[in-house]
A protein has these predicted regions:
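N-terminal regulatory/effector-sensing and dimerization cores
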Residues: 22-127
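Short helix-to-turn junction characteristic of helix-turn-helix DNA-binding domains
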Residues: 63, 200-203, 252
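Short, Lys/Arg-enriched N-terminal segment that forms or immediately precedes the first helix
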Residues: 45, 177-184, 230-232
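Basic/polar phosphate-binding segments, predominantly the helix-turn-helix DNA-binding elements
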Residues: 171, 175, 195-202, 206-246, ...
């Protein structure tokens, strides 16, 4: 995950050096009958005006780094690392970066008939085969899939993309049917918390208490906690923990470092706490995860 973010920051630095407007660059990394996957890097920022777009296919985009504001006919959401942007074919949408520059996503695109068949096979009624919400927070049920997609950006040939695309679609459809649309929040509070989330993403190895984050955002701890959970779908503690675990999962899958070193470098104070948290999040131990993600 750190390498994925670092590549985004380099792209943003190059855009600034060249004095060019932001742009979205998709790189298709896998495709099959009825589905495709792309590594999408966006270098837009507050200086770029958002514009209306349209989903030509059913879309599930996993945010891997950065963040943005997303609005569609299904609702709106602040997209942060680990969250899912959802779109049904034919929906109009708009992305904006009022609170910071750039994002990087792994986008899964599905042909409408293919996606509808997957949703039906998952047991979704006809009304639930189109997304009624704009986004999904970084939920534990999605963590293994989010981490596998991150690994795939670095090792494209090693990931069973079709299996991942099918599993992601089915799980997202089932989870999305139980998610409520987000209520509107005061813009000043939303902006402050959005900046705090970017701060967290850049300082995952630091001590990030609720009080400290609230002070830096200029909000009381209560209002910060309430606004953060409404925007991100999880508490600050859960967000930091899951971000650290995704980073650790990526390091375990792509490198050969010892588990204890991965734990410490990912911001955990001791390996026993790391092992418990990792197993709770991914359903297996760090070593078992490393073995299971060595697909070849």
């Amino acid at each position: 995950m750190a390498k994925i973010a670092a590549e985004l920051w380099r792209a943003l630095a190059q855009r600034q050096k060249d004095g060019l407007p932001g742009q979205t660059t998709p790189r298709v990394i896998a495709r099959g009958e009825g589905w495709s996957v792309a590594d999408v890097v966006c270098t837009c920022g507050p200086q770029d005006d958002p514009y209306e777009e349209r989903h030509n296919q059913d879309t599930i985009a996993i945010v891997q780094a950065g963040g943005f504001e997303y609005r569609s006919t299904a609702g709106r959401g602040l997209m942060t690392a680990g969250s899912l942007m959802l779109g049904s074919h034919g929906q109009s949408f708009e992305c904006a970066h009022r609170h910071g520059d750039g994002d990087r996503c792994v986008s899964f695109w599905y042909a409408p008939d293919y996606f509808e068949r997957l949703a039906a096979d998952a047991g979704a009624g006809r009304a639930d085969r189109r997304f009624k919400v704009a986004s999904m927070p970084a939920l534990r049920q999605l963590s293994p899939l989010v981490a596998q997609a991150a690994v795939g950006v670095r090792r494209v040939a090693d990931v069973p993309w079709e299996e991942l695309a099918v599993t992601l679609a089915v799980r997202t459809v089932n989870l999305a049917s139980g998610v409520s649309a987000r209520r509107g929040l005061p813009l000043h509070a939303e902006a402050r918390v959005a900046r705090a989330i970017r701060t967290i993403d850049h300082r995952l190895d630091a001590s990030l208490s609720l009080g400290r984050l609230a002070r830096e955002a200029g909000l009381s701890p209560y209002h910060f906690l309430r606004t953060f959970k409404s925007l991100a779908g999880v508490t600050p503690h859960q967000y930091v923990l899951r971000a650290r675990l995704r980073e650790a999962a990526s390091r375990l899958a792509t490198g050969g470092a010892k588990v204890v070193d991965v734990a410490l470098e990912s911001g955990f104070g001791d390996v026993s706490n790391f092992n418990r948290a990792f197993r709770a999040e991914f359903g297996e131990s760090p070593l078992a995860w490393r073995r299971s993600t060595r697909w070849t």
